[in-house]
Amino acid sequence: MQFPESWLRSLVNPSIGTDELAHRLTMAGLEVEETEPAAPPFTGVVVTRIVDIAPHPDADKLRVCQVDDGSGALLQIVCGAPNAAAGLTVPLARVGAELPGGMKIGVAKMRGVQSSGMLCSARELGLSQDHAGLLELPAALRPGTDIRAALDLDDTLFTLKLTPNRADCLSILGVAREVAALTGTPLTAPAAEPVPVTIDHRLPVAIQAPDLCGRFAGRVIQGVNARAATPEWMKTRLERAGQRSVSALVDISNYVMLEVGRPSHVFDLDKIGGDLSVRWAREGETLELLNGQAVALDPKVGVVVAGEQVESLAGIMGGEATSVTLDTRNIYLEAAFWWPGAIAGRARRYKFSSEASHRFERGVDYASIPEHIELITRLILDICGGQAGPVDDQCVNLPVREPVRMRLARCHRVLGVAVERAEVAQIFTRLGLPFQEQGDDFVVTPPSYRFDIEIEEDLIEEVARVYGFERIPDVPPVARAKMHAQPEARRGAHAVRRLVAARDYQEVVNYSFVEAAWERDYAGNDNPVRLVNPIASHLSVMRSSLIAGLVAIVRHNANRKQSRMRLFELGRVFHRDPQLADGPLEVAGVRQPLMLAGVAWGGAVEEQWGVPHRQVDFYDVKQDIEALFGARADALRFVADRYPALHPGRSARIELDGQPIGWLGELHPQWTQQADLHHAPVVFELDFEALAERRLPAVRKLSRQPVVVRDLALWVDAKLPAQAMLDTVAAAIARDPQLSVVQDAQVFDVWREKPVAGQTVTEKSLAFRFWLQDTEVTLDEARVADCIARIKDALVAAHNARQRA
């Protein structure tokens, strides 16, 4: 909202400067976004009157003017403006004047004729972009008067950035109320005595929709002169408030809206073809608005109709058919209270906004309609003349303002400062809030123009604004200085993120809602948790797996020529669980575990000259997962199994201590082809709780004895997993004290014979390497051979293995 400071000070004039006024408004919640002068700086420009004018002797487009600048002697000015004429009052930049942009005026000769100054256009003074001719000033101005004083150009323009709840401040009167409350300066509100009723003409109005219009007032005014000139003072105020002057009738309506916050509408009475009705629109009705836009109406939009002809979009904009023109003689003046809920969003439906709708959808004073009708009427009669009929004021459904109770103790607790009871009473009085004191409570009845006061905290805010936020002391919060316990056996989400990032993965964050097809294809979930109000039709269900979102990102980036990606996401998934009850962090029937998922696609390592290029594979990602578990990696098992999103022959169920915690594998060929990827990404998904728990390392003394390394190769069934044999070795070491010197065991070779035509290979050779070391003595060959024999016997007994020659 923009307005000139002089207009505000005509209603309330505190003895503080412009900067202090702007500061106080901002600190009270009415943010002053900008202040700027009404005109740029310039000096030496005065009011002058053209006394005589003659053609230039040597230029067809120039004329020689004799002007009176109030100095007692006529000055000669050469001018080329087309509107220069004898008797015209215009600005004169005297010799020595400095205009905006730094231009200095001196004595000059123009085609041989001396010119002692310059007559100015509005653009040359920085007042507007109009440069078609000289700026024409009111004839009543005295020559020689400094034009800055004559036109009040030292005024300041305020621009307020109002919050939606302060609709009462969308007017000069509303801001003036605030200034009066903040400074204690008396307020002079605009008012008008009821005008004499000289005709008895009425226009019948029927309010058929009380939920649309709560109050409707209007009157007939006959014999107006629509061609009357808008007074300069009104035009100046309108222009400085960002409104262009249209015609006297329109300007008066806009002026009162800006001054007291009352939108109104002026109909051409002679164009109204019947009695008025206020109702909701009907399907198929249309209206051409004042802005030239034709709109199709429906029952969600309010209208004012004459007979069956729609004439106005209620509370938003009038229709072109009954608009006033310069030939209008008889008018119907209307002001109403439209319910905010009936106006909100309607203008935006038609892709425009209006000053009226901006105010009505926030709430406009419903009690002062008759007074404002009289104010508008008085201005019309004074400027345009005419005869006024009686005011027809219908109240059918006005808001009921419930009293709001504010406890003084609650106010002190919220603000953190004990505002005296008498000062609270004074604040409410200055704000114009009627109240009663009941013990230590204040019971306030909100005024008709304050739609933002509904609860106790609203009143506490009013106290804080006027009391002054800067008066509330800075009190740092007091709390016990207690270190947050961080169990070493558990790590948080951020620690896990750092671990995954250290493995060359980048974090992404996807929507928790996904396509229903993703749930079916990637998670085998035909009954996902569905959204009641999805943000998009295709994002209609909650995810039960993170894999689909990661694959979508890989596809998106692969289409943009990215050749290598390693991504992870830590987020919640959503599963139906009828047994789950409501809780502080739970929703009944929906389990929301935290999961970690990752995807690797492209080269196993960044492309470089020293390493041959190869695609990332199952075992690369398996190694990453084992690294995440650290000391607990020996408890991991990767069991061949199937999952809807994964390749049926290249996927595994991940188990920790025998409990399933996730999945690992290549993306299913069908989904790889669907994503248009030339090779399959490797994906994994893990339960975060399994990662959060960690085993603390046990400290043990380092042995000073040498390590002995032995290899053992065995023939076993071709389908036997190597992990099963390693588990057998670990079990043997755990139960046999003689094997305590075996420190580690690993598979280092797998060999299969080439299949002969018509025969199937039934055996494979697994070669194991063992590291043996005692902490006290050097192992001799007999002890080493005994340990290897014991391990071999355990493997033979458990897996029917036989030693390879």
From Swiss-Prot:
Q: Which residues bind Mg(2+)?
A: D452, D458, E461, E462
**Domain FDX-ACB: from-to ranges:** 703-804
List locations, semicolon-separated.
Answer: Cytoplasm
Keyword Magnesium listed? The answer is: yes
**EC number(s) stated in the UniProt entry for this protein:** 6.1.1.20
Q: Example GO molecular function term?
A: phenylalanine-tRNA ligase activity
- Provide the leader sequence positions: none
Q: Give the record's GO biological process terms.
A: phenylalanyl-tRNA aminoacylation
* Keyword terms of this UniProt record: Aminoacyl-tRNA synthetase, ATP-binding, Cytoplasm, Ligase, Magnesium, Metal-binding, Nucleotide-binding, Protein biosynthesis, RNA-binding, tRNA-binding
For this UniProt entry, what is the primary localization, expressed as one broad class? cytoplasm
tRNA-binding domain sequence ranges: 39-148
- Name the reaction it catalyses: tRNA(Phe) + L-phenylalanine + ATP = L-phenylalanyl-tRNA(Phe) + AMP + diphosphate + H(+)
Task: Tell me which cofactor or cofactors this protein depends on.
Answer: Mg(2+)
Q: What does the annotation say about its assembly with partners?
A: Tetramer of two alpha and two beta subunits.
What family does this chain come from, according to its entry? Belongs to the phenylalanyl-tRNA synthetase beta subunit family. Type 1 subfamily.
Q: What is this protein called?
A: Phenylalanine--tRNA ligase beta subunit
Q: Which gene encodes it?
A: pheT
